[in-house]
């Protein structure tokens, strides 16, 4: 999966919707998180926005339950200028939405938010999340093809081919069009 492009697509979507102060929440201890951050930065820079490391929340596996929520909530309490949040995944997005709801922040009226993974979670709430889909059929097809090649005598060296799958933006109702304000 091209996670860099996924992070780019989400951030670019928010920019196109008129957002100018976009917080990024990314996982520091895995490749996907770093690639999604890279895409976020690329979209900001392409739009002429200054990258601000203070607008990025980095978390690790061991603090994923608390740090993303407490950090974004604290940014709101500190009156940090922000109008959108790009999240590492759907689960983190909904955790942050819960924390923001507790302090009276309404999604998407007050703040837009995106996820990543297009998980079942993204569609089980009244708020459907704008997210990135993993093309499951394509992944299954590629896995099957690799398995067939292996069964038919393909060498392990031949199997080390890297495939980059294109991410797909799934539009929900978690983002407000700020161009209409």
Identify the role of each PLM range.
Residues 1-181:
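Bacterial carbohydrate/catabolite-sensing allosteric modules
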């Amino acid at each position: 999966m091209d996670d860099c492009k996924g992070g780019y697509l989400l951030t670019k979507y928010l920019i196109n919707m008129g957002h100018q102060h976009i917080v990024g929440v990314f996982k520091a201890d895995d490749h996907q998180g770093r690639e999604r951050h890279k895409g976020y930065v690329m979209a900001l820079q392409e739009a002429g926005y200054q990258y601000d490391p203070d607008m990025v929340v980095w978390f690790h596996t061991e603090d994923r339950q608390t740090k993303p929520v407490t950090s974004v909530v604290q940014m709101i309490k500190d009156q940090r200028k922000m109008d959108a949040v790009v999240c590492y995944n759907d689960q983190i997005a909904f955790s942050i939405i819960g924390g923001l709801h507790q302090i009276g922040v309404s999604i998407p009226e007050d703040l837009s938010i995106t996820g990543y993974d297009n998980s079942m979670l993204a569609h089980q709430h009244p708020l459907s999340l704008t997210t990135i889909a993993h093309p499951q059929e394509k992944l299954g097809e590629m896995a099957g093809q690799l398995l067939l090649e292996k069964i038919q005598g393909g060498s392990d060296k031949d199997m080390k081919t890297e495939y980059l799958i294109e991410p797909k933006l799934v539009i929900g109702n978690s983002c407000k069009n700020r161009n209409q304000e």
